[in-house]
Every structure is written in C-alpha cells, then in structure tokens.
Amino acid sequence: MLAPTAIIGTSGAVIPRTIRYYGITSLLLYALLLLAIWATIASAGQRPWDALILATAPSIALVGTLNWDLLPVALLALAILAWSRERPWMCGVLVGLGAAAKLYPLLLLIALFVLAVRTRRFGGFTRAMLGAVGAWVAVNLPFAWLYPEGWRTFYDLSRDRGFDFGSLWLSLRFLGVPVDALDPSQAVAGLFGLLVVGIIALSLFAPMRPRLVQIMLLILIAFVVTNKVYSPQYALWLLPLVALARPRWRDVLIWQAGQAIYYVAVWLWLNKFTDADRSLDDRSYAIFVLIQVASQLYIAGLVIRDIWQPEHDPVRCGTTADPQGGEFNVERAEVSSKPTGVVA
C-alpha cells in the first residue's frame, strides 16, 4: 500500500530516490506475485481455491520485497502451468529464464526426468531440457561475453562461501558440532545428492506415480535445508509448490509459523553487528534456525506420506490424475519395480 505513495509522493514532498526505487520495485514484484497466483490457479485443476495459500501467506508480507525472488517464483509457476498444458518447449524456456534469475527452477528438470523414467515417456522431458538450456544460454551469454568477471561473481561466491546465516550447518556450529572440519561445498553437494537419490527412489517405487509438484517440492526442500545459506525470502520459493502439493491450511500455517519465527530471529541476530546489547546470541539463534528447518521437514514428511500412501493426498482424493502431470497423465501400463504392476 505504501508503494504508490513512495512513487508519486504526498503534498508535493520531494521523495528520495531510494524510496522511489523501493516503491517502483514493490509494484513490479507484486505484479509478479499476481502472475504467480494466476498461474497457480490455472494449474490447480478442480481446486483453484488452493492458490489462496500463495495469495495470503504471511511470508508474502514479511519477505515479498526483500529481494527479487518473486521473479523466479512467477516463472516457475508459469513453467508448471505450461507443462500441465502439454507445452514442454514453453515449460523449458520458462525454467531457463527462471534459472537465469535464481538457479533453483532447474530442479524442475530433475522431477520431470524422474517421471519420464517412471512412465517411459522422454519426449516432453527432452524438449523441456533443450528449451531450458537454450533460454538460459540466450540470457547469460551476452553478459558472460561482455562482462565475464561480473558474470562470474555469483558463481564464485556460491562456490567459495562458507556456512552462512540461516543454514543448518551454521546452527550446528553454534551448538558445538565440529562442522568446520568439512569442506562446505562437498558437504552440501554430498548431503543434497543423497537426499535427491532417496527422493528418486521413493518416486520410482511408490505404489502410484507421484505428482510432479510433490517431487519438485521434496527436491527443493532438500536444496534449501542443505544449502550453505538460508535467506528468509527462500520461503517464497516453496509457496506455489506447497499450495499445489499439500493444500491443507493447518499444515501450511504450521510451516509458515516456523518461517515467521525465523524471520524475527534472523533480524535480531543480525542486530549484533549494530547493537550487540539488543541482539540474539548465537546459541539461541541456532535453536530458531532448527525450528525453521523442522517446519520445512514437517511439510516434506507429509508429502512423503502422501506419495507412499496416496489415499492421504488431498488432491488425489477419488482420482489418480495429476493436475500438473501433462503428458505423464496419458494412461498406459507402467512396468513397476514392484512384484505387481500398476497403472500410472
């Protein structure tokens, strides 16, 4: 609501450039939020009201304007919509554009590959992958060519940074666990890789083909939980996926409560750099980080149960279809690794 005032001012007052910039940025970000909400409504099939989870989540008010993360959020939501409409090329292009803003939309390709293996339908996945690579290269190549040092900065930082604020690793250090003996990049890659292998195994051996957003949500939770850093706005990444994968208000509110608690804790902890007497100590901060991690794992645990016991899945109640399944919804006999075959 402050954005229009920040742009045009009141009573002829001169508005500082920083406030004007914030106002314009906020309007653009909330336009992207509306786009993400529309895409979620369109992707939700017979449950369009599930998009209210995205529209009304406390995280939108708390961290919606903290960074430009609503851009990849909107692009990933559009990519899922494109896949649900059986437009793999468009899905891939949107994934590539999203990955140019934040790398995490690329994780959707892992989920698509898993379902391609399970259904033995690789055509759509191949087109989506090519579209993603092409779009990412088209956006990044000019900057990598003209400004190579600036372009590499993000990737160098991601490679070289240690365990940073909000991460499980930093909280373990504050609690006395000797994580400093680990190489940060190797530790993160190793643990994330193990979790992804587990998610793939779950998806391939589940009694019914998992839904696309269920697999994507599990992979993304594994990514943010094991990452070197956890910024408060990362909760935005999960919102459309939670709305589509686990649309139960009780569970969403439990998860959002954990995120809100962490939001308060991280600013209190960071306050030690300006006012140490009014800040949160390291050990207390670590406890709040673990609460945030537990809220993510709570959602992940419910989704795992929904995959292994589909009767608990609120979206699949009375049906086997996946609203976002796209070409994977084409019925065919699936050769299962279980003793008895099932129909995807």
Question: What is each PLM-predicted segment?
Answer:
Residues 162-226, 307-344:
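Aromatic/glycine/proline-enriched transmembrane-helix motif characteristic
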Residues 72-88:
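Specific aromatic-rich, kink-prone transmembrane helix
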Residues 11-47, 76, 195-203:
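Transmembrane-helix motifs of polytopic, lipid-linked glycan transferases
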Residues 64-72:
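Short acidic/glycine- and proline-prone juxtamembrane loop motifs at membrane-interface regions
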Residues 107-134:
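Perimembrane helix-loop-helix junctions
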Residues 37-58, 90:
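Transmembrane-helix signature of polytopic, membrane-embedded enzymes
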